[in-house]
């Protein structure tokens, strides 16, 4: 068993098995009694929404059935106007899926705070958690980023690697689950790029990611 922990990144489209692979890495770390930190580039978006909805941060089980259903189901949002009509004083509502709320919030705040706002948020959160560990735990700790969706997120994990002195391994996920989906949202383009290169489920794409970031791919 290698004592020094690593940094793992997972890339794949919707429903490609990223959560399953992250869970497998968690189980493996637990079997080796190795500490683990989960880095989630969507966590800052979720906490922003939870603060808007409830007034405080709320821990969400992202592997649970409730969260999966919330992303798929639509909610009614009351508006002080009627969409697509010039009637500003009429109350109306719009239906929005949980996944759409996450995507729209993430993209809009990027326009305000920079394209890498969530990458910076997550890298800081992970590095701060790692820095609070004992020297032994920090050395052995694995860090898992369950979903890389943008160049800036990949750049962020290499920055975390510099701060922690850990090796990076990035794997491609392409398991075709019942929820497997190819769509044109900007957050899916990163994974689709590697799909277009012919990458298969389980491939180590670390060097391909580096080449993409260096502009060589």
What are these regions (language model features)?
Residues 1-9:
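Extreme N-terminal, non-catalytic leader segments
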Residues 13:
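P-loop (Walker A) phosphate-binding loop of NTP-binding proteins
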Residues 16:
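ATP-binding Walker
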Residues 19:
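Walker A/P-loop
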Residues 27-38:
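Post-Walker A helix-loop "phosphate-sensing" segment adjacent to the P-loop in P-loop NTPases
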Residues 43-143:
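ATP-dependent small-molecule kinase phosphotransfer cores
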Residues 101-104, 121-189:
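ATP-dependent NMP and nucleoside kinases share a basic, alpha-helical "lid"
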């Amino acid at each position: 068993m290698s004592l020094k922990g690593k940094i793992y990144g997972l890339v794949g489209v919707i429903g490609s098995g990223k959560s399953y692979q992250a869970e497998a890495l968690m189980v493996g770390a637990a079997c080796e009694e190795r500490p683990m930190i989960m880095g989630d580039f969507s966590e800052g978006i979720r906490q922003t929404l939870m603060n808007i909805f409830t007034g405080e941060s709320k821990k969400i089980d992202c592997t649970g059935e409730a969260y999966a259903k919330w992303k798929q189901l639509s909610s009614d949002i009351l508006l002080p106007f009627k969409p697509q009509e010039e009637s500003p004083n009429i109350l109306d509502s719009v239906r929005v899926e949980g996944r759409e709320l996450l995507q729209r919030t993430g993209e809009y705040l990027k326009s305000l705070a920079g394209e890498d706002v969530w990458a910076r948020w997550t890298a800081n959160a992970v590095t701060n958690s790692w820095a609070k560990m004992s020297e032994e735990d920090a050395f052995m700790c694995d860090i898992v980023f369950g979903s890389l969706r943008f160049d800036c997120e990949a750049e962020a994990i290499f920055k975390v690697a510099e701060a922690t002195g850990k090796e990076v391994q990035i794997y491609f996920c392409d398991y075709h689950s019942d929820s497997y989906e190819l769509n044109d949202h900007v957050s899916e383009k990163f994974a689709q790029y590697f799909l277009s290169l012919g990458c298969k489920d389980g491939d180590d794409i670390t060097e391909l990611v580096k080449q993409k970031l260096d502009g060589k791919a």
